[in-house]
C-alpha cells in the first residue's frame, strides 16, 4: 500500500503563503500527488528513480518544474538534504515559434473584419501590454478606464501593466457599446470570467481558420511579440525588463535575439558566395 501524504493540507497552506500563482500551486500539488501515488516513500532511491523517469519522457524545462515541486515539499518536511539537483537547460541562440508582426497584425485585422470583436481585443491586449494570459483574465473595465493594472508577482514585487492610449480608447468604446461598465473585460458565453485554457483553445481555432500556423499562435507568443516590437521601437532593455516583470535583465536579453525565421532570412540575403 502506498504511503499517503499526511501533511498535504499544511503544505498547500505553506505554498499559498508564498504568493505563488494558482497554476503553480496546482502544479506543485499535482506533482506531489503523482509521486506518492507511484512511489512508496520519499527515499533517495525513489527520488532518483522519479528523476530518471522524468528525464526519459519530458523536456528539461518540465523536468525542472517537477523537481522544483519535489524540492519544495522536501524542504517543507525537513528533508532538505535529499533535494534533487535540477538539470541543465541548453539555451537556444534564437527565439522559437514567435508570431511575426505581420501575422499578428493580420490576425487582428481578420478578427475585426469578421466581427469577432472580443477576440480582436484579446489578441490586441496580449500583443500591446505584454500580459501573461493569467494576467489578461484579471483585467477589469476599471483598469481599462485608468490605463493601468497593478500586479503583485512572486515575493510581493509590484509590477504595473500599462494599457496604451490607442488600445485603451478603442476598448473603452467597445465596452460602452456592449454596456459593460464594470467587472472583468473578457467573459465566456456563460458571462463568467474566461479561463486561460479557453483563450488558448480559441486562439488555435481562429489561427486555423485564418491560415496562420498554430505553432506560433498561443498566448505567450504575443508576449514575446510585445517584447520584440518594443525593443525595435525603443531600445531600452532595462525598461522592458521592468514592464515584463522579469526578476533579472538576463531573462529579457533573449529578446535581443532573432527568431529562427529571421536568422534564416538574413542568411539567405547575405550569404551568396
What annotation goes with each model-predicted range?
Residues 1-273:
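Conserved catalytic core of the tyrosine transesterase superfamily
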